[in-house]
């Protein structure tokens, strides 16, 4: 099937038409080629749970900020509870796949791989998460889930242990589903006005980038790079993102939340010969440095927003998982490197699992 025949979005069609000559196959950063850490014998008491029920309904979910003002910074406890319940099966899939892939890449037990494939295959055959009846929270769940699944899948697909070699038919079913989800994600998040482009768009672009590499789709890769550039050019001279500053007391937390997808996209682009580090005068570096400074002293964020910053998320080590790709891109030294080492290992299911294993495998694990 040709590239143009596969495309069902005007945004992707334009990129395909003007994308230029043929390219080499897309690849992930080097760490994704790592093999199984140490083959274990026996079942290790691993038990494959039944796959969560595939979510095929309308992607209409309540927002945890329901009833908040335009800053969208005040949590609605009742709405969050309803959101968690209605999305429980999706989140169970995301976390379960990430965990099982991590276990398999550590121990190499076939049951761990078989269970992962069974879960993903069940959802793929049900055409789960593909509803076009969605609200903002619904399309957000779609791209978060896709990034989680594709991010984990990359560790299986590119590992030199070749775990998928004996499962090619099932892998094809799953990857075709990923591609359809990515195409819908492109439709969901394309052509937004600049004032509406924020961390959600960056996370959408990460999910599309991960899927692009998993399925070798240059059109998806180009879309993710394009969205990255929009995000990078939103970073101002002081390292602030105006649309995240709007989050008032949670502005610093949302700047930190914007970094993981941007850093991952830049890292994947770099692996494919596209250097995004200098975009908008090193915007990604500026953004990261601003967040690290703000985590130590949030006064600049308070001055910019007029609000004392909510620091709860900034005290959670895993929220800094972006440091792994970011430090590879910008060669961290000194205090930043020490802070990274102090917080390792970084495990983020929305980024596909154990990023320290991928980017800094020689780091001493503290767990």
UniProtKB/Swiss-Prot annotation:
What catalytic activity does the UniProt entry give for this protein?
Eliminative cleavage of alginate to give oligosaccharides with 4-deoxy-alpha-L-erythro-hex-4-enuronosyl groups at their non-reducing ends and beta-D-mannuronate at their reducing end
Q: Which GO terms describe its molecular function?
A: poly(beta-D-mannuronate) lyase activity
- Transmembrane ranges, per UniProt, are none
Which BP terms in the Gene Ontology apply to this protein?
A: alginic acid catabolic process
Keyword Membrane assigned:
no
Compartments (UniProt record): Periplasm
User: What EC number(s) does its UniProt record assign?
Assistant: 4.2.2.3
Binding residues for substrate: 63-64, 136-137, 254
Q: What is its main location?
A: periplasm
Signal peptide positions are 1-24
Q: Which InterPro entries match?
A: Alginate_lyase, Alginate_lyase_dom, Chondroitin_lyas
Task: Report if keyword Signal is assigned.
Answer: yes
- One cellular component (GO) term of this entry: periplasmic space
Domain of life here?
Answer: Bacteria
Keywords, ordered alphabetically: Lyase, Periplasm, Signal
Q: What does this protein do?
A: Catalyzes the depolymerization of alginate by cleaving the beta-1,4 glycosidic bond between two adjacent sugar residues via a beta-elimination mechanism. May serve to degrade mislocalized alginate that is trapped in the periplasmic space.
**Family designation:** Belongs to the polysaccharide lyase 5 family.
In its UniProt entry, what is this protein called?
Alginate lyase
Biological source species? Pseudomonas putida (strain GB-1)
Please spell out the taxonomic lineage of the organism that makes this protein.
Bacteria, Pseudomonadati, Pseudomonadota, Gammaproteobacteria, Pseudomonadales
**What gene is this protein a product of?**
algL
